[in-house]
Each structure stands twice: as structure tokens, then as C-alpha cells.
Amino acid sequence: MDPIPHSITRTLSRFRTELTSESGSLAIHELEVAEYKASASLRYLACLVGLPWVIPISLRKGLEPWVTNWWNTGKSHQIFDYLQEENALGRFEKIEELFLLERMVEDSSGTHSQDLRIEIHKETIQLVEMYNEDCIQIISHLLTNLIGFAFISAYLILGKNQLAIINSWIQEFFYSLSDTMKAFLILLATDLCIGFHSPHGWELMIDSISENYGFAHNERIISGLVSTFPVILDTILKYWIFRRFNRISPSLVVIYHSMNE
């Protein structure tokens, strides 16, 4: 059998070398692309966490002088009169009752009656100033929240690629865990958010949101939301766990229900 010509062996050797170098450069390129995507996604996640805190502070400082000037023109008071009139009247009645009770305990005289009128007048002026400041704060918070919500929504829409990468990381980390650890994490998250010991947290959150948007504290509405909303979330979550994990990992569903009991 004739030996293979040197030209063919040199050609094969050169082809192997080029293929190896191309594979190495391709691997390096893929690694650089992966590192870039990872760093971009982490920056995006950091911005997504920080924006809800930074946007309200920065916007409120810029909007509050404009809102104060707009409100003090006197043409806009009727907009929020319906929302705050009941609160203002309630405060005024309480102040008047306290002063009357205080003066009834003391000896009645003309000077005391005059002092009572002066003090009620001072408290009324303070009440009007408080009412004016409350309305300005409500409008500022409302505008800030609306602008911030629009900005964050646009940020989420424009960052679909980064969200997809972050979602893939979370899924990869979650599915790499054992079924027992998965069930533990799901149970921990559900108990913290919608468990039997979470109603007080829901009350604080709903009350804070209502005050931020200028709504008066209403115990009935808060109690109704606390007694129904977490139950609805719990039902939806259990249905999602059953539908999603019953096909992927039936043992996870069994472990979750066993730990939940």
C-alpha cells in the first residue's frame, strides 16, 4: 500500500489546526457573550429593585413646588373637597369637644369664654393649614405614583431580554434543588405572604396604600380585603402548583401537601 502523500497530510494537519483554533475562538466568543448578558442582566435587576425607591424621592422633590403653587391658586380646592371634607370636619368637631369639656370642668366666666373662642380660632387655622398640606401631599403622591408606574412599566417592556435571562437563571436554580427543598421554599414563601400569621402585614400594607392615595382609614374595607384577598391568592397558588408541578414532578406535589398538613 502506497504511503499517503505529504501534501494530503499537511492539508489535513492544517485543516485540523484551523478547526481547533476556530473552535477555541468560538468558545471564547460565546463565553464573552454569556458574561456580557450576565452583567447586563444583573445591572437590569439592580435598577429594577432600586427604581421604585429612587423615582418617588426624585419626582416628589420636583413636583411638590409645582403642586403647591397649583393648589394655592384657589381654583383646584373642589377636586379633593369630597375626599377630605369629612376628615376635616371630624377633626374640627373633636377639637371643639375637647375645649368644651375642658372649660366645663373649670369655673365658667366671661374671660374663659373669650379664651375658648380664641383657642378654637387658633386651632381652626391650624386645622385649615393641615388640611391644605394633606391635600398637597395627596396630589404629589398620586402624580409620583402614576409617573413611577408608567416609567417602571416601560422599563419592564423594554427589558424583555434581560427578564428572560433572569427567569432562566431562577428556573435553573429552582429545578436543580431537591423536591424536598423546593416544597420547603414554596411553603416558606406562601406562609410569609398569605399564611395564617400574615393578616397584620396585609392590614399595614393596605392601610399604607390607602393613606398614600388619600383615602380615609376604613376598618370595614381593610377587614374585608384582608379576609378575602389572601384566600384568593392562596387558592390560585395551590391550583398553579398542582397544574405545573403535577406533570413535571408529582413527588413535589405530594411532599408539599404533606408538609402543608
Curated annotation (Swiss-Prot):
Compartments it resides in: Plastid, Chloroplast inner membrane
InterPro entries for the chain: CemA
Catalytic activity reported: K(+)(in) + H(+)(out) = K(+)(out) + H(+)(in)
UniProt KW keywords: Antiport, Chloroplast, Hydrogen ion transport, Ion transport, Membrane, Plastid, Plastid inner membrane, Potassium, Potassium transport, Transmembrane, Transmembrane helix, Transport
Main location: plastid
Membrane association type: Multi-pass membrane protein
A molecular function (GO) term: proton transmembrane transporter activity
GO biological process: one example: potassium ion transport
GO cellular component, one term: chloroplast inner membrane
Leader sequence segment: none
Taxonomic superkingdom: Eukaryota
Transmembrane parts of this sequence: 138-158, 184-204, 221-241
Function: Contributes to K(+)/H(+) antiport activity by supporting proton efflux to control proton extrusion and homeostasis in chloroplasts in a light-dependent manner to modulate photosynthesis. Prevents excessive induction of non-photochemical quenching (NPQ) under continuous-light conditions. Indirectly promotes efficient inorganic carbon uptake into chloroplasts.
HAMAP family given in the database record: CemA_PxcA
Family: Belongs to the CemA family.
Protein name: Potassium/proton antiporter CemA
